Structures are given as structure tokens and as C-alpha cells.
């Protein structure tokens, strides 16, 4: 028997590429997570449909996230495999798409909590293996589907409590006093700029990594008064297979521990009364206990919106409704079209003028129902209002992004000259555009936690949208090694792809009533809300300055030959460096330029000018701050 776990573990990159090129197209429409209503032998443990069989909710969202296509195929999150029933008709497998196979077509019945393949049976669990069976009424055949809270796997950000203080300030998970020492308490502090101890990354294996140190993770601390259900939280050295250091986020936005799956991270005390509030690992009083609910900042709210089930605009197909729509469209556009919705994505029209024209329109005598006319008129006014605000958000983002890269060639040449790098050479460097963007937006949210996430929300959505687009179109941001002579062309191509991805997201939203409504609502959330897209009052000059500095740093890292990188050793620890030419030391620690595979092996004599002058340039660009970006930005 080939089960789900067997196939998922046997897949590799070359197989995935083959599947992409040979499979029949079936475009995924939206992502979902399927949770079994079966509680396990202890009647507590939750189980989820996973590419590694049914397990508890884990941090690696990709293995428990599925894509449902409009024709009923259920894809893995990568889009490379689909669910199918085995030839024996019992176990479920992950296989290559075959659009002619009825057993690869599934129906999700959210009313009765059932998932059915085309053979008429029902998705079931047999000793934690996924199978199909005739209807039996057991809990193992009952599933609930939902969009799980976004998990910032691989991205830096804050874990903010949903509970605000009396002044509507957000509080975040924080390492006490920003200490890099192990066994330091993890507490709650008000989210603030440049507090590196508040920034975390959820790794693919479920560890929550602190930005303070590359080996510092969230761990369970000592018991509270000897309790077996209440613990403090500490930092500790990373241990690969320690379940006490591994975490997940469930559909209630609770961060639970993999060793104690019924215990979640919360806090005791009142936010705002004390400058520091203690965090605990304990059992929430309920699924809605707000003291145990968290928001990842940035939330990447657009990711969720563009992944949801499409919701079309209200249809006007006949009678006075259709006549009203066509008349208003024609009147608003001065006779250009009788379908105004077709222009929402057009960059050459003024939607504000359309709105004024629709508002001033009066019902003609040819339309008998003034109620139908008013209904359509109000709907189109709402649509135009939403479209205007959505376009404004993306136009501002595009302006920021264009400014960031507008002098890309000049900046690249200047930096190369400063550190004696020959941009015409065939020296291979790491042209990792995604890493560069990650560094830029980490810098923004670190320096401007209130508001910076708005830019990051759009950018990260563009990156992920581009990756999905690339899977089916061989286009989008690419990550590979290039020669110095090709670096600018490579970066420019990725920049143009990124701009195109943002445009695709905007157009996707503007062509869907549900997505447009949800995005419009985000445009009016308070700026300090992690899901906000409210650009009013944002200091774009400050954001651009921070982003430009971080991008220059990322470029310098790219200009290093691929076998060299920047290492960091905290103050008080031994730094393996033999020459000051290869290092810089300040109060936080020592930064070293050395080979990726050997931190004791430094650049050869031929790169002497490169190595020494590059450190001088780093100093000029606020060295300690920038190397801090480089330390974790890759």
C-alpha cells in the first residue's frame, strides 16, 4: 500500500518539475484546512488532513493546507499532487493529476461535514491512515473545513495578543530585556520599534525562533507552583526534535505546544497596568478566551482574501435591473460601454468621474421600476467606492516599490565600485531577490511596527501570489545564482515580475465582489491593526529611507561571492577570526566575513580590496544595524 506519507516523502524537486510539465491544467481556486471531528483515544487530540497522514495542527502550514480547484480536484499546497482513491478503492493517495479520473473529483459538503470522492464513498480515518468507506455515521467521517490563521513560516514578525490595553495598544510576545542568554523569561511588552526581542520566526518544523540569536527559540519554562498544566515560558538553545520547543497555531488563533497539545500560550495580569506582563503556558478557559488568542503581524491579510472562494458581482440578466445597469454604465462612461464593471481594472479611466456620473444619474422613462433603478445605482456606487480605494492602496504601493528600485542600476554600480567588484566579470554571486525583499520588509516592520505591516502585507502577498502564478506559467520571482555581469538584468526582471504580481492581485480583487468588499474593509481599519491596509497618515518618506538602506545591504550581500557570507558572534563568546581585516566588533558582538561552510576560512588574497573596503562601506551604512539584517535575512 502506498499511503499519503509514503508519497509525500518520496517526492523531490525533479519529480515536481516533471509533474508541472506533464499534468493537465486545473487551476486551484482557494485553500482550506480539513479538521476531523474525531478526537482520538483521549477524546481531546485534534487531527487534520495532512500530507503526512492525520496529525495535530502543526506549524508547517503547507502540509495541512489544500487547494480546491473549481472542478473538484484537491491539490497539495504546492499544486503538484492531487488526492485520489487507490486502485483497491480504500486508501487515499497523492498522485499526478488525471482529469479523466472520477476518483480524483471530490465534493466538500460543509452542511453535513462530509468529504466525498467521485465513487460515492466518504473520506474516513483508519488507524490514522486516510481512506474512503461507505457512510457509517462515525466521527471519523466528519470533517470541518476552514481557512487556518496565517502562520508566518519563514518570515520575521510579531506575535501580538488580540487583547488590547485600555489605550488600544498592541502587546507582543517578548524576550525579557532583549537578553540573548538562555533560560530568559518570555513576557508581554507593548509592541515598539527597534525591540528586536519582540520579533520571531515560525520555522517549518514548528520552532519559534527569536530574532536575538540564530540558536535561541521559545521553550517551556519551569512549572508554576508545581502544576502540571501551568508553566512559565523561557528561551533556550535550539533542539531539533524536542516537542517542548515545537508549536502550532489552531483555528482559534491559539499557539499550542506539541508536547502538551491542550496547553496554549497566554498571559496573566492586565495589559497596560504594568510595563511587563508574564506569559504562561496553560489551558484556555474556552476557544474564545482572548487572553490566549494571537495575531501574527504582518498578517498577510491579502493572502487569505485572494485565496477565498470567488463571489461574483450581483447579476443583472433581464428586465429593469439589466436595463438600469446598462443605462448607468453608458451614462457614467459617456457612451464608452454598457458594462462598467469591465473597466474597474483599466488604468486609463477615472473611476471618481464615473462615481459622480452614477450619483447624478436619474431614472429614464424607458425604465419602469424606479426601485430597480435605485437598487442598481446604489450597488454600482458601492462598487466604485470600493474599487477607488483598492486601486489607491495598490497605486501607493507601486509608487513606493518603483521609488525603491528606480535607481537600481546606479546603486548597484556605485556599491560595486566602492568595494572594488568588477560588474563585468563572470564571478558567480547569489542573486536571491526574495531574500533581498525579505530583508527590506523585515527592516520596515522592525523600525515601524505600527504601519510598516501595511507595506509588508502587500509585498509578501505579491511574492506568494507570484510563486503560485509561476507554477502554472513559468513566470515570477526566481532565486538562483548568476554572474556579476548578469546581476542587474536578473534583479530588474524580478522587480518587473513583482510589480506584475501586485497588478495581478489588484485585478483579481477588482473582478470579484467578495474580495473587493473584504479588501475595502481593511482599508479603513486603524493603522495599528496588523491586518490594516489603511495608508492614511503613513510616512512614506521614512518607510522609503529604511527600505532603501536595507536594500543596499542586501545588494552588498549579493556582491559577495556565493561561498562567502557574514557571520555574527554575540559579545562574550569566542569569535573565530584571525585578522581584523575580516571582522568588525562593537558592543553587541563580532561580525566576520568567511566561507559559508567554514567560518575560519576567509576570502583569498585576491579579494583583499573587496574585503576591507566592504567593511568600511558597512560602517558607512550603520554597520551594526545592517549586519543584524544580514545575520538573519538570508
Swiss-Prot record:
One Gene Ontology term from the biological process aspect of the record: response to cation stress
Pfam family, one: Ricin_B_lectin
Membrane topology: Peripheral membrane protein
UniProt domain Ricin B-type lectin: residue ranges: 27-146, 117-250
Keyword Secreted part of the UniProt annotation: no
Localisation: Cytoplasm; Membrane
MF annotations from Gene Ontology: carbohydrate binding
Keywords carried by this UniProt record: Cytoplasm, Lectin, Membrane, Repeat
Region of interest (Disordered), residue spans: 1-23
Function as written in the Swiss-Prot or TrEMBL entry: May play an important role in stabilizing and/or regulating the cell membrane during Ca(2+) stress or certain stages of development.
The protein, known as: Calcium up-regulated protein D
Gene encoding the protein: cupD
Amino acid at each position: 500500500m502506498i499511503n499519503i506519507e509514503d508519497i509525500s516523502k518520496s517526492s523531490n524537486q525533479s519529480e515536481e518539475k516533471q509533474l508541472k510539465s506533464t499534468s493537465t491544467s486545473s487551476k486551484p481556486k482557494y485553500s482550506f484546512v480539513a479538521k476531523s471531528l474525531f478526537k482520538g483515544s483521549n477524546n481531546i487530540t485534534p487531527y487534520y488532513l495532512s500530507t503526512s497522514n492525520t496529525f495535530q495542527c502543526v506549524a508547517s502550514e503547507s502540509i495541512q493546507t489544500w487547494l480546491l480547484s473549481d472542478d473538484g480536484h484537491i491539490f497539495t499546497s504546492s499544486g503538484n499532487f492531487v488526492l485520489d482513491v487507490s486502485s483497491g478503492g480504500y486508501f487515499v493517495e497523492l498522485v499526478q493529476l488525471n482529469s479523466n479520473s472520477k476518483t480524483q473529483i471530490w465534493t466538500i459538503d460543509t452542511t453535513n461535514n462530509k468529504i466525498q470522492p467521485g465513487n460515492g464513498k466518504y473520506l474516513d480515518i483508519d488507524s490514522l491512515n486516510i481512506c474512503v468507506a461507505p457512510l457509517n455515521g462515525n466521527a471519523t467521517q466528519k470533517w470541518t473545513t476552514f481557512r487556518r490563521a496565517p502562520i508566518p513560516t519563514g518570515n520575521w514578525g510579531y506575535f501580538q495578543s488580540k487583547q488590547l490595553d485600555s489605550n488600544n495598544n498592541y502587546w507582543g510576545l517578548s524576550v525579557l530585556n532583549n537578553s540573548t542568554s538562555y533560560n530568559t523569561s518570555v513576557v508581554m511588552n507593548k509592541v515598539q520599534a527597534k525591540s528586536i526581542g519582540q520579533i520571531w520566526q515560525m520555522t517549518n518544523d514548528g520552532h519559534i525562533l527569536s530574532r536575538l540569536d540564530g540558536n535561541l527559540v521559545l521553550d517551556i519554562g519551569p512549572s508554576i507552583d508545581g502544576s502540571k498544566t501551568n508553566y512559565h515560558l523561557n528561551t533556550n538553545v535550539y533542539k531539533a526534535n524536542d516537542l517542548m520547543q515545537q508549536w502550532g497555531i489552531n483555528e482559534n488563533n491559539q499557539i499550542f505546544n506539541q508536547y502538551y497539545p491542550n496547553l496554549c500560550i497566554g498571559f496573566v495580569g492586565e495589559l497596560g497596568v504594568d510595563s511587563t506582563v508574564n506569559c504562561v503556558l496553560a489551558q484556555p478557559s474556552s476557544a474564545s478566551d482572548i487572553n490566549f488568542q494571537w495575531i501574527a503581524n504582518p498578517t498577510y491579510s491579502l493572502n487569505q482574501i485572494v485565496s477565498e472562494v470567488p463571489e461574483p458581482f450581483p447579476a443583472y440578466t433581464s428586465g429593469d435591473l439589466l436595463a438600469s445597469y446598462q443605462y448607468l454604465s453608458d451614462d457614467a462612461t459617456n457612451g464608452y460601454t454598457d458594462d462598467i464593471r469591465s473597466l474597474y481594472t483599466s488604468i486609463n479611466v477615472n473611476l471618481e468621474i464615473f462615481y459622480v456620473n452614477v450619483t447624478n444619474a436619474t431614472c429614464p422613462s424607458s425604465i419602469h421600476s424606479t426601485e430597480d433603478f435605485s437598487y442598481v445605482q446604489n450597488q454600482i456606487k458601492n462598487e466604485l467606492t470600493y474599487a477607488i480605494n483598492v486601486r489607491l492602496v495598490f497605486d501607493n504601493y507601486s509608487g513606493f516599490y518603483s521609488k525603491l528600485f528606480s535607481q537600481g542600476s546606479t546603486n548597484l554600480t556605485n556599491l560595486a565600485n566602492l568595494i572594488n567588484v568588477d560588474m563585468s566579470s563572470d564571478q558567480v554571486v547569489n542573486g536571491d531577490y526574495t531574500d533581498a525583499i525579505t530583508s527590506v520588509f523585515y527592516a520596515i516592520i522592525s523600525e515601524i511596527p505600527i504601519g510598516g505591516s501595511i507595506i509588508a502585507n502587500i509585498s509578501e502577498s505579491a511574492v506568494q501570489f507570484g510563486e503560485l502564478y509561476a507554477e502554472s506559467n513559468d513566470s515570477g520571482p526566481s532565486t538562483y545564482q548568476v554572474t556579476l555581469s548578469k546581476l542587474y538584468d536578473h534583479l530588474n526582471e524580478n522587480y518587473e515580475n513583482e510589480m506584475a504580481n501586485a497588478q495581478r492581485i489588484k485585478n483579481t480583487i477588482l473582478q470579484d465582489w467578495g474580495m473587493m468588499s473584504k479588501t475595502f474593509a481593511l482599508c479603513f481599519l486603524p493603522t495599528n491593526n496588523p491586518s490594516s491596509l489603511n495608508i492614511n497618515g503613513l510616512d512614506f518618506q521614512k518607510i522609503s529611507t529604511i527600505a532603501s538602506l536595507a536594500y543596499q545591504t542586501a545588494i552588498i550581500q549579493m556582491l559577495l561571492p556565493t561561498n562567502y557570507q557574514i557571520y555574527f558572534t554575540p559579545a562574550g563568546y569566542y569569535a573565530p577570526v584571525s585578522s581584523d581585516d575580516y571582522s568588525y566588533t562593537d558592543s553587541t558582538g563580532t561580525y566576520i566575513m568567511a566561507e559559508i561552510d567554514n567560518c575560519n576560512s576567509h576570502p583569498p588574497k585576491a579579494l583583499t580590496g573587496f574585503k576591507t573596503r566592504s567593511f568600511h562601506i558597512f560602517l558607512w551604512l550603520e554597520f551594526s544595524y545592517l549586519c543584524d539584517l544580514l545575520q538573519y535575512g538570508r
